[in-house]
Amino acid sequence: MINLGDKQSTIVVAMSGGVDSSAVAAMLHEQGHNVIGITLQLYDHGMAVGKKNACCAGQDIYDAKMVANKLGIPHYVLDYESKFKESVIDNFVDSYLQGETPLPCVQCNKSVKFRDLIKTARELGAAQLATGHYVRKVNGDNGAELHTGLDPAKDQSYFLFTTTKEQLEYLSFPLGGLTKDETRRLASKFGLEVADKPDSQDICFVPDGNYKSVINKIRPGASESGKIIHVNGFELGEHSGIINYTIGQRRGLGIAYNEPLYVVKIDPKDNIVYVGPESALHVQEFIIKNINWLADEIKDNEKLEVEVKIRSTRPPRLAEISKLDDDKMKVKFLSEEKAVAPGQACVIYAGERVLGGGWITRDIR
């Protein structure tokens, strides 16, 4: 059993209503801590009441309250609909309209969950904010370090790369050394009804999985048809709006050709989707921006060999990074990688440790 310090310290738990955060609340309560549960209502409550496989939906708020009542701990629901729309949903929509492939869960952790929940936890006099993420905080020579969860199948470090050093010092991740099965067994041991609740699968504010309808609702008429052009320069047809295409996409292009074609570039300024053979997807280097760095500072002209992940589901790849300025880095793969998508995160690792990361720009070669 993981122990988070002195008995009777106050710890706020970010309770989503799922099995992970519920198990954390129960675990800390059993250890004798003064646990306070907080759940954020992030989007249209009525739309999501029946949605059970998303995060922070109406059913999940009910489940979080039910768990808190069983444990006998205080529980608060904070209305964050306006903040969530402004910081996450609008960003998600605008990213697609800019020809990018957004990552709303990272934006939510950065702009809403960690920033504001930590502020609230401090106001409540809590010593820590605990979450149900599968990552580890390790005390290094220069302070807290962010490490991958021990269970590679559940590791969530890719989604937490924007966590700052200051935030990391205040956060705790009790499940980082556990597997999902172990967490479910803990929840069963505590008698929690959510022990067998399915994991969230979808983007929480896209309850039916149709992100295009969300975009069209928020920015009606913003996505117009345009040209599909082969990377060799000739026109192949017309696309139905750039929001319908992502880098690496092969199906649903609506064009006929004598070899398989993939989306290799999206130009939002001229409203063009470029396609080409699979070989055109191969990338050697690219630029990332809005860097969050958790390790020792990289010197100017220094080249550092690391591992990077450009999608949460892809394994890390060897690469060389170098600092361009305080907000940009160049990432060069040691061997070519396929389908690097602007708008996605590039997270940088040294073994199990997260060194930092940034957002992939259009500067891809």
Swiss-Prot record:
<keyword id="KW-1015">Disulfide bond</keyword>
<protein>
    <recommendedName>
        <fullName>tRNA-specific 2-thiouridylase MnmA</fullName>
        <ecNumber>2.8.1.13</ecNumber>
    </recommendedName>
</protein>
<dbReference type="GO" id="GO:0005524">
    <property type="term" value="F:ATP binding"/>
</dbReference>
<dbReference type="Pfam" id="PF20258">
    <property type="entry name" value="tRNA_Me_trans_C"/>
</dbReference>
<dbReference type="InterPro" id="IPR023382">
    <property type="entry name" value="MnmA-like_central_sf"/>
</dbReference>
<feature type="site" description="Interaction with tRNA">
    <location>
        <position position="344"/>
    </location>
</feature>
<dbReference type="InterPro" id="IPR004506">
    <property type="entry name" value="MnmA-like"/>
</dbReference>
<feature type="site" description="Interaction with tRNA">
    <location>
        <position position="133"/>
    </location>
</feature>
<feature type="binding site">
    <location>
        <position position="40"/>
    </location>
    <ligand>
        <name>ATP</name>
    </ligand>
</feature>
<feature type="binding site">
    <location>
        <begin position="14"/>
        <end position="21"/>
    </location>
    <ligand>
        <name>ATP</name>
    </ligand>
</feature>
<keyword id="KW-0820">tRNA-binding</keyword>
<keyword id="KW-0808">Transferase</keyword>
<dbReference type="GO" id="GO:0103016">
    <property type="term" value="F:tRNA-uridine 2-sulfurtransferase activity"/>
</dbReference>
<dbReference type="Pfam" id="PF03054">
    <property type="entry name" value="tRNA_Me_trans"/>
</dbReference>
<dbReference type="InterPro" id="IPR046885">
    <property type="entry name" value="MnmA-like_C"/>
</dbReference>
<feature type="binding site">
    <location>
        <position position="132"/>
    </location>
    <ligand>
        <name>ATP</name>
    </ligand>
</feature>
<feature type="disulfide bond" description="Alternate">
    <location>
        <begin position="108"/>
        <end position="204"/>
    </location>
</feature>
<keyword id="KW-0547">Nucleotide-binding</keyword>
<dbReference type="InterPro" id="IPR046884">
    <property type="entry name" value="MnmA-like_central"/>
</dbReference>
<dbReference type="GO" id="GO:0000049">
    <property type="term" value="F:tRNA binding"/>
</dbReference>
<dbReference type="GO" id="GO:0002143">
    <property type="term" value="P:tRNA wobble position uridine thiolation"/>
</dbReference>
<feature type="active site" description="Nucleophile">
    <location>
        <position position="108"/>
    </location>
</feature>
<keyword id="KW-0819">tRNA processing</keyword>
<feature type="region of interest" description="Interaction with tRNA">
    <location>
        <begin position="154"/>
        <end position="156"/>
    </location>
</feature>
<keyword id="KW-0067">ATP-binding</keyword>
<comment type="similarity">
    <text>Belongs to the MnmA/TRMU family.</text>
</comment>
<dbReference type="Pfam" id="PF20259">
    <property type="entry name" value="tRNA_Me_trans_M"/>
</dbReference>
<comment type="function">
    <text>Catalyzes the 2-thiolation of uridine at the wobble position (U34) of tRNA, leading to the formation of s(2)U34.</text>
</comment>
<keyword id="KW-0963">Cytoplasm</keyword>
<feature type="active site" description="Cysteine persulfide intermediate">
    <location>
        <position position="204"/>
    </location>
</feature>
<dbReference type="GO" id="GO:0005737">
    <property type="term" value="C:cytoplasm"/>
</dbReference>
<keyword id="KW-0694">RNA-binding</keyword>
<dbReference type="InterPro" id="IPR014729">
    <property type="entry name" value="Rossmann-like_a/b/a_fold"/>
</dbReference>
